[in-house]
Amino acid sequence: MFSVTRRRAAGAAAAMATATGTLYWMTSQGDRPLVHNDPSYMVQFPTAAPPQVSRRDLLDRLAKTHQFDVLIIGGGATGTGCALDAATRGLNVALVEKGDFASGTSSKSTKMIHGGVRYLEKAFWEFSKAQLDLVIEALNERKHLINTAPHLCTVLPILIPIYSTWQVPYIYMGCKFYDFFAGSQNLKKSYLLSKSATVEKAPMLTTDNLKASLVYHDGSFNDSRLNATLAITAVENGATVLNYVEVQKLIKDPTSGKVIGAEARDVETNELVRINAKCVVNATGPYSDAILQMDRNPSGLPDSPLNDNSKIKSTFNQIAVMDPKMVIPSIGVHIVLPSFYCPKDMGLLDVRTSDGRVMFFLPWQGKVLAGTTDIPLKQVPENPMPTEADIQDILKELQHYIEFPVKREDVLSAWAGVRPLVRDPRTIPADGKKGSATQGVVRSHFLFTSDNGLITIAGGKWTTYRQMAEETVDKVVEVGGFHNLKPCHTRDIKLAGAEEWTQNYVALLAQNYHLSSKMSNYLVQNYGTRSSIICEFFKESMENKLPLSLADKENNVIYSSEENNLVNFDTFRYPFTIGELKYSMQYEYCRTPLDFLLRRTRFAFLDAKEALNAVHATVKVMGDEFNWSEKKRQWELEKTVNFIKTFGV
């Protein structure tokens, strides 16, 4: 009895001591400064980007450099990825792109960083090691991409509604295998939801025959902004990267026939430039066959004249490649819908489409992205357009899932992109029959070197761009005989805007610049730690705070508030401002209104009709900055309006 009492007394004393110590610690904190005054919590907001090389200086460097180590043709995901990889290894790099960065396929993806659950299913049913290798490679690269550009990427839960009892264990095991093959790179574990929990998460789903749902995780990202960020990061690492420079001819050694460079034209000035290089890489995606034609031709010229872009065309659906040998062209169409078509922070996956495809419905930039179709073609179009049948096909599939009526008038935007599905052009049979179906094609990449030394990389997808670039630059090092280079380290490079990024940057930016949470969130998700530079433009003038859709209206009243409440656009539908446009022109090589409205921002992709309201102001601001003539302004205005009108509106 005595021992029990003693133990209780000892326990009480210990508890008292702990309480006293805790009380002392709590009261002693009053003598310390508040946490936001602690220097360790202070953030240095950049007010200017690293010294930017002007386009004029890049053109001069392109023309005056005696010989580059490597010339990369194509400024999409793979091309800019190659430029960054090669530059950071120590090579002297030139890259030219005939349009804007991501003006082709690289801006028209499903905005997913994924291994591909559909490929995993095919791998098992078809006993395909190629499909399985594709999944494993993509799962590894998925995590690397999110780490190098965390401001542009996010982990996205995706819900698969299940309407057959037998599918519950089938889909559950499939997603668990997906987690397993990701290994240490897995984002989050998949999990099963009951019918009631599914309806709570996604009340828009039809409940007829709904049994349960499975949630797995992949990544979501902003494709064209990532593309521009890769180009900018490559320039900041010493590469000579230029948009609107079109290769017109490959230069060949007169004795050996080896490709030793290219003749190119600056689209803006019509200046011609000769680019000499030890190695040349063809990274033009679905347009790879156009450069391969130049490679096969002893003169280095294309088989057919290049498109005449000197005047506005009545149609944008020109043919880029008449008879592709390497690329198996396929069109994928996406549409954008209001946010109520899927949960705010969770995507939906349709695994039971009428023709055996899968279809995604994903939250993206405050809207819902739905797609895609898979339509085989015989030719490669320059700028494919969605048809009404394509749009209706997606709406029809969506209606299978949605409880309320799916309406055509809800479509805010629609666009089409060419998938760069590939095969080895050296294996085409003599009769030239290449087939047209694409669903059975592995969405992998293909790298080969022609007899003339041209290195071509094509295929793949956004998720694996970094791996594709690494393999390509490895081949450049081999073909060029380069020595004493740094190893590839693009897995660890923080892209422009990811430097010093933290998950609290939205709050820190809002506090420092007195932004609304909506504006701060938008800027950080698209520009990362460089968003503060746009805020400096806001501080320069009231005009820079105007949203572009209102900027050409007379007698604008921006807002009525205290002086230090810098920008509060919660009352406006879209946060795209004059300040952001000026930043894009000064720091991101934005050269045309379409560059800004489609690719530096995603305005036209998100709401084509509303983007049309911003065209006049965009042309005016850019025209004033670049000293455009009235004729040039009118040309850009018509071109921009006509192009945006092809977005399903």
UniProtKB/Swiss-Prot annotation:
FAD binds at residues 69-97. The keyword Secreted does not apply. Its main location: mitochondrion. Keywords: FAD, Flavoprotein, Membrane, Mitochondrion, Mitochondrion inner membrane, Oxidoreductase, Transit peptide. Its cofactor is FAD. Pathway: Polyol metabolism; glycerol degradation via glycerol kinase pathway; glycerone phosphate from sn-glycerol 3-phosphate (anaerobic route): step 1/1. It comes from the Eukaryota. It is an enzyme of class 1 (oxidoreductase). Pfam families: DAO, DAO_C. It catalyses: a quinone + sn-glycerol 3-phosphate = dihydroxyacetone phosphate + a quinol. Its EC number is 1.1.5.3. It is found in: Mitochondrion inner membrane; Mitochondrion intermembrane space. One of its GO terms (cellular component) is mitochondrial outer membrane. GO terms for molecular function: glycerol-3-phosphate dehydrogenase (quinone) activity. One of its GO terms (biological process) is glycerol-3-phosphate shuttle. Belongs to the FAD-dependent glycerol-3-phosphate dehydrogenase family. Present with 1670 molecules/cell in log phase SD medium. This is Glycerol-3-phosphate dehydrogenase, mitochondrial.
